[in-house]
């Protein structure tokens, strides 16, 4: 006769049935859960942060990158994205965009932009609108607060900084300190129409806010009153010059088309140079080509996209990136400028821009479309290329969103 089970024996055996990983943890015949939630399979994976460029698979689990290697079985994942013949990168990081009710973070996300910084649309007086967009966005959105308290809205012909009463350091600092989770730095536009003769004072005031807090100044250059070397002298390591390939006056080239020595010196001491494509006075083929031929490639590429720019000279971030294939940069160089380098430019993004194991699972998949493609600069000069990046799939925090 079998021995009678005591209550203690019964409780112990019942507990064993509930232990994870035991043979009885799932009903007989039920298939095991897949090892990975999602697999991006068979694409050319370009991860500049890891110096990785090869055909491989990207496996995702729990919203994080779990493995990057060739030959991962499709049966090991719940969902598979077939990326054969396509380019797989970390999610794009666009550090200069202008959001509003029309150009939403969701619109940018559909083009592969999984993180973005609004470049000064909002100042201290209307920062709540930008904060709302950042709070409600699925992708990661941070703000570069305009030193001009009304941002790009409401001042009309006065401009953000033409009247320094609009550049109140105390007011801007309070807005930054109240929203440190979402404000990544200060934006200043230094062109004559926005700052006039106040451009140098604007840099000084912006630095008064950012330097004690370890934040970034992004300065829009081109067509300024003051010479660029005087502006650069006031910028600190980690600060960003945007519109690096803006035409004269007061761009990065001298009258003979040679790179100013002060520009190289600024880079050597840690100032970053960003593209900021935009629509007017920010990027010309001539300046970009001359600078790149002299070895002065951008540190980061950004779109400076606005709602009107979606149909005029900018179009979307992948189109901006594709222009630099035409200008002679390699695809890995371009991807670096829009992922790892862009993420490192702003502390709020430094865990992004990579497919390293454990990183947030933000992934973009592109078709590198071959054929005649027309690209246009800010002067509406058309050049023809042969390759264009076209979004094919986007993964945000491990979930496919395109």
Where does each model-flagged region fall?
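C-terminal cap of metal-dependent C-N hydrolases
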Residues: 43, 360-402
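Divalent metal-coordination and catalytic microenvironments
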Residues: 43, 63, 85, 112, ...
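His/Asp/Glu-enriched, well-ordered alpha-helical/loop segment
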Residues: 286-368
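Active-site core of metal-dependent hydrolases
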Residues: 188-291, 295-311
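Divalent-metal coordination cores built from histidine and acidic residues
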Residues: 107-190
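Di-metal (Zn2+ and/or Mg2+/Mn2+) metal-binding site signature of metallo-dependent hydrolases
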Residues: 86-107
